[in-house]
């Protein structure tokens, strides 16, 4: 399994190494747990077990996890950040990372399908205005940005990426066709 590394990373024998954050957050208020969970998810980390999250080691992931560790401590929690290598079960960790990214990719594909349905509704309702076009353009930009964030976290090149690329291409083509229709309708004064 190949790891895509964009920075020098610690480790031996070409192994990028791993960073593991083990933490405990006070049970109340519950928003603290949610904040930590969202931050860990946004970094692309996976949970090895409750309150133990792992990421491939890099300078940027180390900075992000150090920052999160400080925030947890400021929440009156405890946290330790470890740099380590996997002695056994590394393929399981890789699979867990790929599954997490594939889940995110699948969600983006679902949203792309929603986008295509929305454009189809515009045709059905005969809504060919610049306002509708702009709204759809904004939605497509959001999808592209979301994909870029997930792609950045996808250090093991999960298979689901190709499906998103195809779905986004379909969205772009659909929006281009819709835009052409809007311009034609506006030119005719409809």
Spell out what each predicted region is:
Residues 1-120, 125, 145-148, 152, ...:
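Positively charged, polar, low-complexity stretches
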Residues 103, 107-110, 131, 138, ...:
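Alpha-helix boundary/N-cap detector
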Residues 127-140, 148:
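Transmembrane beta-strand segments of outer-membrane beta-barrel domains in Gram-negative
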């Amino acid at each position: 399994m190949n790891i895509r590394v964009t920075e020098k990373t610690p480790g031996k024998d070409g192994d990028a190494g791993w960073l593991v954050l083990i933490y405990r957050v006070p049970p109340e208020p519950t928003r603290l747990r949610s904040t930590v969970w969202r931050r860990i998810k946004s970094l692309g980390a996976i949970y090895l077990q409750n309150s133990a999250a792992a990421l491939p080691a890099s300078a940027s992931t180390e900075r992000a996890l150090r920052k999160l560790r400080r925030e947890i401590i400021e929440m009156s929690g405890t946290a330790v950040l470890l740099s380590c290598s996997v002695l056994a079960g590394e393929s399981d960790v890789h699979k867990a990372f790929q599954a997490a990214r594939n889940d995110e990719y699948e969600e983006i594909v679902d949203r792309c399908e929603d986008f295509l349905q929305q454009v189809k509704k515009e045709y059905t309702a005969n809504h060919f205005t610049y306002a509708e076009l702009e709204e759809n353009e904004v939605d497509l930009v959001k999808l592209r940005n979301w994909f870029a964030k997930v792609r950045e976290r996808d250090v093991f090149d999960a298979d689901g990426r190709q499906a998103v690329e195809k779905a986004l291409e379909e969205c772009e083509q659909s929006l281009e066709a819709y835009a052409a229709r809007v311009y034609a309708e506006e030119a005719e004064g409809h």
